[in-house]
């Protein structure tokens, strides 16, 4: 078979799953994929690689490549490498990202750009898949187009000059030189989807509705409203293209427990883990606020954990105990929850390079695995739905699961699974005849990820302490009936601190006394650039509505101590644009901000209240932070463009961060007198110079 090298760089398992799908399909198309994690540099060598390269790369943090790609990126970023270092290399790259974030698919773009700078050329156009609208909209056609591109490459490599472009929309020359063009693939690929002929694909199963659902042919449909469990024409009568069945590879044996003690320390982590006590918890909002915001103080005095303002850290959290018990009960495993789970690879598996899941510790209990290791709230991927089909006995339920994982059912999958935040438990309750084995769940459920939080303190101000702030997340899951769920981590933390929670709406500068009993496990996050400038004379602008204010409290505490230590120092202006709903309900850190303002640490404080109506004949105040930024556009432009200032934005990526970005574009356009495109280029330059920094989340 014709061999190609297949590398993946994954953070939460998405890129790995897609690479494994490519690997499985390769055999059907007459290719052999040499599959490796990009971190396994001892198993491949790009310097001497002669086969074509396919790379699947996700994005994490603020546009960073995954942790698994850290070493690889560092090596290829070596500026001493010659420009023809990879001139022999031909590759195709699929980037994964979320367009709700500013640095969309940036992990893939970083690698893609650097490979080309070192002489590598495309044999297939780069794809950018968007998790905001559904990765499959790009992933599926990109994979479908990979096979003709590989065939074309192998034909041309026999004596002809390599051709770098594979899709009909691109010319070979432009795909080598025009990086911007590749960013349009996530739109173009939806057009390409119409060009690929799926009728002859061996890796799909075409199912006729009459054959699969013949027992329902005489049923009169009275309610034409579709749902998770029911479809309507034309989908209910369509022939379906469904994915190939993922090969099973785990063999599970349950053994009675020997009674050994388990703890969250057993949870696997690439970074060091510290168990630290909670020394204080304070409610920052009133009881009638729309969201409940808590401040938690951790005692890190007996650890080697260190941080600086602007850093983030991860909290290792468990799944909800009630959800774990409900899932075990539905799987008819509740009487075996304390049994040890022994895993090994099936001797006859067809999965290439199958390995045991690294996030499941050896010999731990079933209860521990479902509580600490598996993301049971994860939205099931189509491959998981396809696997569940074969363990569903009811023909109507089987057909519906087939529809949801099919190409024809993409809209229903988005509406009833992805957008409804459906999880495995929702599906199992909605499809009662589905009885999957434990091994299947361990194969498909991803690792329970630690949750990141911004440090909301300075170690100069609070020695031996670490503060963080969070809203208790609540959301409606609408998969079957409406269910109000709390965030996995914030719901757990709220329960954990309930007995020690101080109901004050303002956090105190004073320590509350002895460390309290509850402990949590935390780990440091990789270093980022969301830090105060090294030169304290540089003016800064901070934009942080809601809990986005967290890192800026650390900035201000740090600056206060620096000014105490250097009373004659030259310190730049500090602007803060803060926003909340109501002045009297959720004005976080009100007392602290007044303190910083009074003592000249904070030079300008601009607060927006989005839900407070004007009183009497008052003019309507700035409703959101971006409105306040616009009101002070002249000063903002002066700081950024004339005084070499920095701007930091922290908070919601979906709306706020984009609105702030748009406001900055308008300000620069107006104050400098340039077109919006030129203003956008100016902001892009600020980002490159690390003077426009973001710490945002969805």
From Swiss-Prot:
GO terms under cellular component: cytosol; intermediate filament cytoskeleton; nucleoplasm
Outcome of substituting residue 22 to M: May increase risk for spina bifida
Keyword S-adenosyl-L-methionine: yes
Domain of life: Eukaryota
Modified residues (Phosphoserine): 171, 189
One Pfam family here: NAD_binding_1
Tissue: Found in all tissues tested, particularly abundant in skeletal muscle.
Biological role stated in the UniProt entry: Key enzyme in methionine and folate homeostasis responsible for the reactivation of methionine synthase (MTR/MS) activity by catalyzing the reductive methylation of MTR-bound cob(II)alamin. Cobalamin (vitamin B12) forms a complex with MTR to serve as an intermediary in methyl transfer reactions that cycles between MTR-bound methylcob(III)alamin and MTR bound-cob(I)alamin forms, and occasional oxidative escape of the cob(I)alamin intermediate during the catalytic cycle leads to the inactive cob(II)alamin species.
Note: It is debated whether the reduction of free aquacob(II)alamin occurs spontaneously or is enzyme catalyzed.
UniProt key word Phosphoprotein: yes
Subunit comment: Forms a multiprotein complex with MMACHC, MMADHC and MTR.
Catalysed conversion reaction: 2 methylcob(III)alamin-[methionine synthase] + 2 S-adenosyl-L-homocysteine + NADP(+) + H(+) = 2 cob(II)alamin-[methionine synthase] + 2 S-adenosyl-L-methionine + NADPH; 2 cob(II)alamin + A + 2 H2O + 2 H(+) = 2 aquacob(III)alamin + AH2
GO terms under biological process: cobalamin metabolic process; folic acid metabolic process; homocysteine catabolic process; homocysteine metabolic process; methionine biosynthetic process; S-adenosylmethionine cycle
Annotated disease: Homocystinuria-megaloblastic anemia, cblE type: An autosomal recessive inborn error of metabolism resulting from defects in the cobalamin-dependent pathway that converts homocysteine to methionine. It causes delayed psychomotor development, megaloblastic anemia, homocystinuria, and hypomethioninemia. Cells from patients with HMAE fail to incorporate methyltetrahydrofolate into methionine in whole cells, but cell extracts show normal methionine synthase activity in the presence of a reducing agent. Neural tube defects, folate-sensitive: The most common NTDs are open spina bifida (myelomeningocele) and anencephaly.
Flavodoxin-like domain residues: 5-147
Entries under PANTHER family matching the protein: METHIONINE SYNTHASE REDUCTASE, NITRIC OXIDE SYNTHASE-RELATED
Region described as Hinge: 166-247
Residues noted as binding FMN in the record, renumbered to the chain: 93-124
Record-listed NADP(+) binding positions: 291, 610-611, 624-626, 659
InterPro entries linked to this entry: CysJ-like_FAD-binding, FAD-bd_FR_type, Flavdoxin-like, Flavodoxin/NO_synth, Flavoprot_Pyr_Nucl_cyt_Rdtase, Flavoprotein-like_sf, FNR_nucleotide-bd, NADPH_Cyt_P450_Rdtase_alpha
Name by which UniProt lists this protein: Methionine synthase reductase
